[in-house]
Structures are given as C-alpha cells and as structure tokens.
UniProtKB/Swiss-Prot annotation:
Organism per entry: Homo sapiens (Human)
Signal peptide location: none
Modified residues (N6-acetyllysine): 137
Gene designation: SGTA
UniProt similarity note: Belongs to the SGT family.
Listed name of the protein: Small glutamine-rich tetratricopeptide repeat-containing protein alpha
GO biological process entries: ERAD pathway; negative regulation of ERAD pathway; negative regulation of ubiquitin-dependent protein catabolic process; positive regulation of ERAD pathway; positive regulation of ubiquitin-dependent protein catabolic process; post-translational protein targeting to endoplasmic reticulum membrane; tail-anchored membrane protein insertion into ER membrane
Listed GO CC annotations: cytoplasm; cytosol; membrane; nucleoplasm; nucleus; TRC complex
InterPro entries reported for this sequence: SGT, SGTA_dimer, TPR-like_helical_dom_sf, TPR_rpt
Positions carrying Phosphoserine: 77, 84, 301, 305
UniProt key word Acetylation: yes
Amino acid sequence: MDNKKRLAYAIIQFLHDQLRHGGLSSDAQESLEVAIQCLETAFGVTVEDSDLALPQTLPEIFEAAATGKEMPQDLRSPARTPPSEEDSAEAERLKTEGNEQMKVENFEAAVHFYGKAIELNPANAVYFCNRAAAYSKLGNYAGAVQDCERAICIDPAYSKAYGRMGLALSSLNKHVEAVAYYKKALELDPDNETYKSNLKIAELKLREAPSPTGGVGSFDIAGLLNNPGFMSMASNLMNNPQIQQLMSGMISGGNNPLGTPGTSPSQNDLASLIQAGQQFAQQMQQQNPELIEQLRSQIRSRTPSASNDDQQE
C-alpha cells in the first residue's frame, strides 16, 4: 500500500483529533478544517479510509522517534505478535469481569478491567470498544472517541465501533461526523434498528438551525408566523363568533355569554376552548402536515439511543 497515503491519513487523523480535543480557538479550528480538506483533496484520502490506519497514532510514532526508541515492528508491517494462550485467557477473563461491572453500573471498575485486558492483548478491538462504552457512561466522550478509533484501526469491519463512535460524537455535538459513522455502521450492519434510529436523529440535528427569534428549544417562531397556511387558519379561528364570545366573556371577568343553566362559566369556557383547539389542530393536520411534524419534533426530547450498544461482547 502507498506509504504516502498512509502518512497523509495519519496526519489527517491527528488533525481531526486536535479539532475534537485540542482546545483550540475558533480561528485555529477553521484553519485546521481547511488544512484537512486540502490534504484529503491532494492525496485522495479521508478520515473514513480506516484501512490506511497504522497500529500506532502519529503522536505515538513521533514520541518513539523523539526519545530514541526503536521503531516498533508493527509500524513496518500490520502483523502483530499474538499474545500467549495464557495472556489471551486472562484478557478474556478481565473483559468478562468488565462486562459484569457494566451490568451493575460500576463503570469506573469496568474501565479498569477493560484496560487490564487491553494491556494483555492490545490487538483485540472488542476490548477497546467495550471500554469506549464505559467511558461514554461516565461522560468521558473524548476517551470513548479515542477508544473507538483504536478499535476501528484494529478491525475496520467492526460495526459496533462505528456505532459507538457515532454516539460519542453526538454527545459532543459533532453531528456531521456522527452521521458519517452511523452510515458506516449501517453499511456493515444494515438491519440494525438502533443505527437507523440514531442516524435519523443525527440528521435531524443537522437540519435544525437556531432562529434569532427562537424560543425554548430554538423553535422558529418567525418561520411559523411567516407561514401563510398557519396565519390563515389562525385568522379564521380568531374570527369565529364563538371564540370571540368566549374571549370577550373571559376578559370581562367571568361573565359567560355561552353559559347555560346549571353549568358554571368556567366549565363552559374550558369546554369551548378545548373544542376550538381541537378544530384548529385538525385543520392544521389536514392542510399542513409538515408544520405539525415540525412542532412535534420540537416538543419531543430526542436523543440518540444506546439500546443494543449497551450489550457488551
């Protein structure tokens, strides 16, 4: 494989990591994004080309060179020296213990056991992916991203690593990148309903643009008021004689022009208001279903689901 492409990929991967965790100013981040685009165009690679990844990251390679350490063999060849049978068995035992700690929500202990398993067998993508899940439960999304990256480097066809990467990136409000990883997860596991759902949510987040006049949840009040269908129906509602009588009675302090014998004014007011609201909602649903769906989307609290990703391997 072309080592120039490997080097370009390593640099792009490093720059992406700096964007996420480097604590850079907005100007510096913009400069890095431009640099990434230039490198991707010049060498024909992207951060998704995980088959170009080396076992060590660029900072690890640089550190080894700066300290005079011998270049690890696995940087010259993807082949790794497999762990002994004893180490493999102990690593599996530690992983299982980590899984048990996840079940009882002892996430810090789970991180510890997965880390010990990684020390014995650093070529196992599952161990990194499981630790990423534990990091996410602790709110350490940056750590989860790094472990998912390592898992993907080890096994580029590991769908769960892409799915968990998407979750971590979503939690960091990196929805553009989250969408890319969810799509890759679905490409590898097309029947996974959780990936499908999370992809839709991430794409929705991308489409949601805050409005300068928005209220709670960045709802676009200006857009609603500029919607001719909405304004026409609202005008018809307010010109309804029954509604005008109702509002007049409520404003006058409880005088109930719609009242009937034996029924309190408040009951009539409430019933009339509910009826009018139902009629208005039905008209909106029939004439502008897209607007109704927008309203529902704003009201719902929608966050990515980790349902099947909670299951450790």
